[in-house]
A protein has these predicted regions:
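Alpha-helix capping/helix-boundary segments
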Residues: 9, 41, 84, 107, ...
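Short, flexible helix/strand-to-coil boundary loops that buttress conserved ligand/catalytic motifs
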Residues: 14, 24, 49, 92, ...
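Short, well-structured N-terminal submotif of metal-dependent ribonuclease cores
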Residues: 1-38, 53-66, 139
Length: 139
């Protein structure tokens, strides 16, 4: 099974694996599963690096972030394509819960377009299931 991992899951894998639920950990450790991440998540980690946040703990240099994800965590990085942006443009945003993070919206659109489950700890993602998101909650 292919799984799209949200940015927080990448951070937990690299820094705080104890924050991964047993169910999510089992999915990640199953060698039959293909782990993927959106280029948008890579961008978020680089932004975090520049802000001296978690990114600095994940890689020594900003430019090493992609290599760490691919080689260190064995995760494929998927580019954002035009069809992902079209899904993003059609996405109804969860304004009731104040979900205004455009990076989350791109990642959600990526998962919907590719028809793959998105693994995240963000409970606001439930809202997008009625729009086609297959969501696996890390709780």
């Amino acid at each position: 099974m292919r799984l799209l991992l949200d940015t927080c899951i990448i951070a937990y894998m690299a820094l705080e694996p104890d924050r991964l639920s047993q169910d999510v950990l089992s999915l990640i450790e199953d060698y039959d599963n293909q782990l993927c991440v959106s280029m948008e998540s890579v961008k978020e980690l680089i932004v975090a690096y520049r802000r001296k946040g978690i990114g600095r703990k994940i890689s020594k240099k900003e430019e090493d972030t992609t290599q760490m994800i691919k080689d260190g965590l064995c995760i494929q990085i998927w580019p954002i394509r035009e069809e992902h942006i079209r899904t993003y443009a059609r996405l109804t945003i969860n304004e009731a819960q104040g979900h205004n993070d455009p990076s989350d919206h791109i990642i959600i659109a990526h998962a919907i377009t590719e028809h793959i489950p998105l693994v995240s700890s963000d409970h606001k993602f439930d809202f997008y299931m009625k729009q086609g998101l297959d969501y696996i909650c890390n709780s």
